[in-house]
Amino acid sequence: MQWLKMKLRFVNLILLLISSTCAQLGGDPNGYLTYCPCMGRFGNQADHFLGSLAFAKALNRTLILPPWVEYRRGELRSRQVPFNTYFEVEPLKEYHRVITMADFMWHLADDIWPESERVSFCYKERYSLQQEKNDPDKPNCHAKDGNPFGPFWDTFHIDFVRSEFYAPLHFDVHHSNEAAKWQTKYPAESYPVLAFTGAPASFPVQLENCKLQRYLQWSQRYREASKDFIREQLPRGAFLGIHLRNGIDWVRACEHVKDSQHLFASPQCLGYKNERGALYPELCMPSKEAIIRQLKRTIKNVRQTQPDNEIKSVFVASDSNHMIGELNTALSRMGISVHKLPEDDPYLDLAILGQSNHFIGNCISSYSAFEKRERDVHGFPSYFWGFPKEKDRKHTNVHEEL
């Protein structure tokens, strides 16, 4: 008899869990919002994600978490990696309602967003690369034209029946009543899903949205992998994490410094109004000699100010040249070893950098910007290559840490 009671309790518990899950997957009467993270690689996508999360909250719509878009060498089409591969979903719910795109499409889309009602949103007409598709009498978002646009929506078998141009509305919900305008023009009853061809957010991330980084927490897989690497591969003691951006595409991007007031993530060190100075080439592409000088200076400074927690090693993340040989040679007399992952994994690099005692990143890079925001959440110190300028550093009391 006791066994039967326990069995009934177990069945009731299972039913309760099923009921709870169904309730969580019930439709949101306030509507949904999603987008293709189709601009740039992870750093750019992360900036856009924070802005899109804030935008969804301002409109009071559930954010459908898009997969991350990746471009792999030798593959013609982008890869879509589920959001929760790299980051936990639950912490985001402390800020606002979210659901993964897979859960939405598998459990809710047929009822809430049937195929006959799928509308793509863009600011104004987006022209197709295939000229025959461009009809002056029928302007279109061409939401699936090109890579990664087509592969992204194809991942979930999404096609659009028409386009909606939302100009002159915009995404800055912090300095105007823009959210109310969106809600008035696109009520959830008529537009259950706002599906944007690109992220409804600015780049670089708005200052007001940087604080949302606290809700973006690494998945258990990456938390454990990063801790394992630190424990098994790095010598005991404090370590300095660095990000070197030096691939050929970056070399070309840095050529625009001379003609720009801002470039990519430069506001993270120069300020959104350039209140901490103007752009200069060394911020974007520091020389090998400058990198070594700054590393030695940082290590010596930590030894003087934190003698009980000296830096014992350097961990390098890079898109191209990790400079392992050069750095090992330069730092060997200081008793410092230099390390990298055996195989490239930019996400694991970030998870490891986030646990370093000190970090030096690239002011212009949105990848470094992700790391800077993550470290700010935990109160960890961060610095930038070439900032402040070496000549300014000698004549001012500006502290390197930001």
Curated annotation (Swiss-Prot):
<feature type="glycosylation site" description="N-linked (GlcNAc...) asparagine">
    <location>
        <position position="60"/>
    </location>
</feature>
<keyword id="KW-0732">Signal</keyword>
<dbReference type="GO" id="GO:0036066">
    <property type="term" value="P:protein O-linked fucosylation"/>
</dbReference>
<feature type="disulfide bond">
    <location>
        <begin position="122"/>
        <end position="141"/>
    </location>
</feature>
<protein>
    <recommendedName>
        <fullName>GDP-fucose protein O-fucosyltransferase 1</fullName>
        <ecNumber>2.4.1.221</ecNumber>
    </recommendedName>
</protein>
<dbReference type="GO" id="GO:0007219">
    <property type="term" value="P:Notch signaling pathway"/>
</dbReference>
<keyword id="KW-0256">Endoplasmic reticulum</keyword>
<dbReference type="GO" id="GO:0005788">
    <property type="term" value="C:endoplasmic reticulum lumen"/>
</dbReference>
<keyword id="KW-1015">Disulfide bond</keyword>
<feature type="disulfide bond">
    <location>
        <begin position="269"/>
        <end position="363"/>
    </location>
</feature>
<feature type="disulfide bond">
    <location>
        <begin position="36"/>
        <end position="38"/>
    </location>
</feature>
<keyword id="KW-0294">Fucose metabolism</keyword>
<feature type="binding site">
    <location>
        <begin position="243"/>
        <end position="245"/>
    </location>
    <ligand>
        <name>substrate</name>
    </ligand>
</feature>
<keyword id="KW-0325">Glycoprotein</keyword>
<dbReference type="GO" id="GO:0046922">
    <property type="term" value="F:peptide-O-fucosyltransferase activity"/>
</dbReference>
<dbReference type="GO" id="GO:0045747">
    <property type="term" value="P:positive regulation of Notch signaling pathway"/>
</dbReference>
<feature type="binding site">
    <location>
        <position position="349"/>
    </location>
    <ligand>
        <name>substrate</name>
    </ligand>
</feature>
<comment type="similarity">
    <text>Belongs to the glycosyltransferase 65 family.</text>
</comment>
<dbReference type="GO" id="GO:0045165">
    <property type="term" value="P:cell fate commitment"/>
</dbReference>
<dbReference type="Pfam" id="PF10250">
    <property type="entry name" value="O-FucT"/>
</dbReference>
<keyword id="KW-0119">Carbohydrate metabolism</keyword>
<comment type="subunit">
    <text>Interacts with N (via its EGF domains); the interaction is required for the endocyctic transport of N.</text>
</comment>
<keyword id="KW-0808">Transferase</keyword>
<dbReference type="GO" id="GO:0005112">
    <property type="term" value="F:Notch binding"/>
</dbReference>
<keyword id="KW-0914">Notch signaling pathway</keyword>
<dbReference type="InterPro" id="IPR019378">
    <property type="entry name" value="GDP-Fuc_O-FucTrfase"/>
</dbReference>
<feature type="binding site">
    <location>
        <begin position="41"/>
        <end position="44"/>
    </location>
    <ligand>
        <name>substrate</name>
    </ligand>
</feature>
<dbReference type="InterPro" id="IPR039922">
    <property type="entry name" value="POFUT1"/>
</dbReference>
<dbReference type="GO" id="GO:0006004">
    <property type="term" value="P:fucose metabolic process"/>
</dbReference>
<dbReference type="GO" id="GO:0045807">
    <property type="term" value="P:positive regulation of endocytosis"/>
</dbReference>
<feature type="signal peptide">
    <location>
        <begin position="1"/>
        <end position="23"/>
    </location>
</feature>
<feature type="binding site">
    <location>
        <begin position="366"/>
        <end position="367"/>
    </location>
    <ligand>
        <name>substrate</name>
    </ligand>
</feature>
<comment type="pathway">
    <text>Protein modification; protein glycosylation.</text>
</comment>
<comment type="function">
    <text>Catalyzes the reaction that attaches fucose through an O-glycosidic linkage to a conserved serine or threonine residue found in the consensus sequence C2-X(4,5)-[S/T]-C3 of EGF domains, where C2 and C3 are the second and third conserved cysteines. Specifically uses GDP-fucose as donor substrate and proper disulfide pairing of the substrate EGF domains is required for fucose transfer. Plays a crucial role in Notch signaling.</text>
</comment>
<keyword id="KW-0328">Glycosyltransferase</keyword>
<feature type="disulfide bond">
    <location>
        <begin position="254"/>
        <end position="284"/>
    </location>
</feature>
